[in-house]
Amino acid sequence: YATPVMAADARALMDHLGIARADVMGYSMGARITAFLALNDPARVRSAILGGLGHHLVEGVGLPLGIADAMEAASLDHLQDRQQKMFRAFADANKADRAALAACIRGSRQTLSEAQVGAIRCPVLVAIGTKDDVAGDAHRLAAMFPAARALDIPNRDHNLAVGDKVYKQGVLEFLEQRP
């Protein structure tokens, strides 16, 4: 289930709902999907908000495969790696379908080239927690877009940034200011 397929699914959902154009927001894997949607269907994306994904969109392949392994582990007690434990605990707390998450992590490892990122013309917000050791650098990715800005979410890691007030306020301000 590769990222371009997930982006096509998002477009199909927009079609089904009768949404011709939208501000599209995604976090982590959702941000990767948002970027692919903005590249492949630019007329559909008014603006893009990429949370929890920085320059690893270009220079990385997504979440480490060990996180997929952690989703399939018998229990949290079987894990030693801090990052694997963090993601597994988050999935368990949210009663996520861990097998589906593992499959998505393994399947959504596609990157964009710097030229492809530069071809995304809509306004873009790249927002990452300052303690996020998964996403890559927000400022490096924002500099690759023609019209983007970076938002640092202070003292938040990959899992805590998504619900942070600074993130929410930054998104609202971005949407109010975009053309």
Regions found by a protein language model. Name each.
Residues 22, 26-27, 31:
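Conserved alpha/beta-hydrolase "nucleophile elbow" surrounding the catalytic nucleophile
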